[in-house]
Amino acid sequence: MGTLSVNQNKLQKRLRRLAGEAVADFNMIEEGDKVMVCLSGGKDSYTLLDVLMHFQKVAPIRFDIVAVNMDQKQPGFPEHVLPAYLKELGVEYHIVEKDTHSVVKELIPEGKTTCSLCSRLRRGTLYTFADQIGATKMALGHHRDDIIETFFLNMFFNGALKAMPPKLRADDGRNVVIRPLAYCHEKDIQAYSDLKQFPIIPCNLCGSQENLQRQVVKDMLLDWERKTPGRTESIFRALQNVQPSQLADRKLFDFSQLRIDETAASRFVNVVNI
């Protein structure tokens, strides 16, 4: 890729700035970290690797990057694409081979959504591999839109106010997941991916299925944004401004102990003298 135009340069700077803010806000990367960057072959993970490699050059701290892709043995998966790309970049990488495709096809009936099971199997394998190579952080390519969509998916279908945190300690306690693109917009990532001409690998197992719940939510949010620009930005800010006393979760707030504060100043108003 040659010299960037003014708009292309602004796009690159915006992505790097927003990712840098997220990394700083949540203390995602520290001195001496070994960051395992999970690559799927999609636009998000390519952009993530690109941004983190830039940070590695300019950040005031030292950290290592290891790129990891999981070959799930999907039919037609172009095994040569990622190794060739990563060799050209000169970044350390590993290809983890595990046939989760057969497991998913065996357990999920034809026509049903495979994404959830596929994701769980992939996550477990990557957690194990991160532990094996001594990675201190596992970087995923989820962005701002993913986080908002996940919030609504959990609310609509799981009855929970839960999204994707920018930083998370896994249930096993041995892995810390970071999402440096948490503040970045999907449209910017798509534009940057097109600009950089990343060798995109489509997901033939789940990405082509129609009527997935996530796509329904995505379409809903796009429609909201068209009708009321700025609504999704407000939703994202709300995820950073939680007020437990204004909800109804007794595990987060002890409503049972609420009493009148006898020491509080009186709010009596003398109506006669007004």
UniProtKB/Swiss-Prot annotation:
Transmembrane segments: none annotated. A motif (PP-loop motif) lies at residues 40-45. Keywords: 4Fe-4S, ATP-binding, Cytoplasm, Iron, Iron-sulfur, Magnesium, Metal-binding, Nucleotide-binding, RNA-binding, Transferase, tRNA processing, tRNA-binding. Its main location: cytoplasm. InterPro entries: Rossmann-like_a/b/a_fold (IPR014729), TilS/TtcA_N (IPR011063), tRNA_Cyd_32_2_STrfase (IPR012089), tRNA_thiolation_TtcA_Ctu1 (IPR035107). Its cofactor is Mg(2+); [4Fe-4S] cluster. Its EC number is 2.8.1.-. One of its GO terms (cellular component) is cytoplasm. [4Fe-4S] cluster binds at C115, C118, C206. GO terms for molecular function: 4 iron, 4 sulfur cluster binding; ATP binding; magnesium ion binding; sulfurtransferase activity; tRNA binding. One of its GO terms (biological process) is tRNA thio-modification. Pathway: tRNA modification. Binds 1 [4Fe-4S] cluster per subunit. The cluster is chelated by three Cys residues, the fourth Fe has a free coordination site that may bind a sulfur atom transferred from the persulfide of IscS. It is found in: Cytoplasm. Pfam families: ATP_bind_3. It is an enzyme of class 2 (transferase). It catalyses: cytidine(32) in tRNA + S-sulfanyl-L-cysteinyl-[cysteine desulfurase] + AH2 + ATP = 2-thiocytidine(32) in tRNA + L-cysteinyl-[cysteine desulfurase] + A + AMP + diphosphate + H(+). Belongs to the TtcA family. Homodimer. The thiolation reaction likely consists of two steps: a first activation step by ATP to form an adenylated intermediate of the target base of tRNA, and a second nucleophilic substitution step of the sulfur (S) atom supplied by the hydrosulfide attached to the Fe-S cluster. Catalyzes the ATP-dependent 2-thiolation of cytidine in position 32 of tRNA, to form 2-thiocytidine (s(2)C32). The sulfur atoms are provided by the cysteine/cysteine desulfurase (IscS) system. NCBIfam families: PRK10696.1. This is tRNA-cytidine(32) 2-sulfurtransferase. It comes from Pseudomonas syringae pv. tomato (strain ATCC BAA-871 / DC3000). The lineage of its organism: Bacteria, Pseudomonadati, Pseudomonadota, Gammaproteobacteria, Pseudomonadales.
